[in-house]
Amino acid sequence: MPIDPLTPNPPMSRLSTRHSPHPQPLLGLVLMGGGARTAYQAGALQAIGQLLSRTSGPAQAFPFQVLAGTSAGALNATFLASKAMEGLAGLDELAHFWTHIRTEAVYRLPQTPLDKFSRWATAVGLLRSARVHAAAMDSLALVNTLHQAIALEKIDTALQSGVLQALAVTASSYSSGIHWTFCQTRDGQPIPWSRPGRRAEQQPITIEHLMASSAIPFIFPSTPLWVDGGMEFFGDGSMRQISPLSSAVHLGADRILAIGVSQPQRASLSTSARAAGRPSLGTIAGHAMASVFHDTLEADVEQLARINQALDSLPESVRADLPLRPVRVLTLQPSASLDALAQAHAHTLPRPILRVLEGLGALRGSGAALASYLLFEPGFISALMALGQADVQARADEIQSFLAPAQAHPVR
């Protein structure tokens, strides 16, 4: 059954896969990518934490045992893994992290003193950076931000304690074309899955993995990682991600909450976009970004629905002999246009970035989609988080019912 992002209650789906290796049911959290837009996830998860706190008390354990993230969603998943020992407070800390982030803490546009006064000089600097680094922006600031925010050693503590079972981060190899999932698990055993164009490898998650997973094509530089006995260069994990739910399923999740950041519709912008005629470079770039980041989750859930329908048509005696298990999936997507939000806040970007986006036509109409991935500024971040909180509150009963079996023991 297709997901309509405008529908207030997208359906739960079930995926059939091999039996879970874990004796206890596991709840997975899958976080999709989308640059600054993933602040929506922080707001939604904070609201979910508040829901659980009201029903089970603030001492409830961290609710998710399997975490999987892609691109900026991988940053969120890894941050949460490092805070899992703190229980529900970890969800609040993710929101606190996003509340204090700024564009300068994520990336900058390489500049010379002349670039500050000339749009042409800025354009030349952009081309120079693209030639040298195959990327428009310098993301070194994000390396420093992540090192300060994420205590990687605490991930292993959470795994060994049993609070977590697994963390997975995805990235796409420019060198081989393979979409890799890097897994850090409680037992540390090799992850035995390999599919055409998709592979997994057991590795402790590092900041380098996060930089690779979040390296938006053309925007941020690729990151080298050692994999399968050799060095390969990686970019954003959303590229070539055919099945974003598969890593959580392979790692044993029996139920999955998947939070995307896709654009429901551009109804508020469509009339002006038609009147504008030929799309700007910013509009085309935003459309390409949307294809990279947002189409795969919907397609994956649609595929699950088709598989479920086929399985439901089989006699019970046949299904009982299959080496498969049901996996319930609940999806959460923004109920309002993130492009429109970005258009309202784009003027708050640092001046050099603003100048570039203005030149691309990415600050008006449907071109604002591009700005929405790069707008790490307080007004936009706050609006995204508020939307995530409101969307959870609007579906509170449904979400609480879905999460109820995972409500566990108090934090030790």
Give residue ranges: language-model regions.
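Small-residue-rich anion-binding loops in enzyme active sites
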Residues: 2-30, 174-194
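Patatin-like phospholipase
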Residues: 22-28, 36-140, 144-146, 183-195, ...
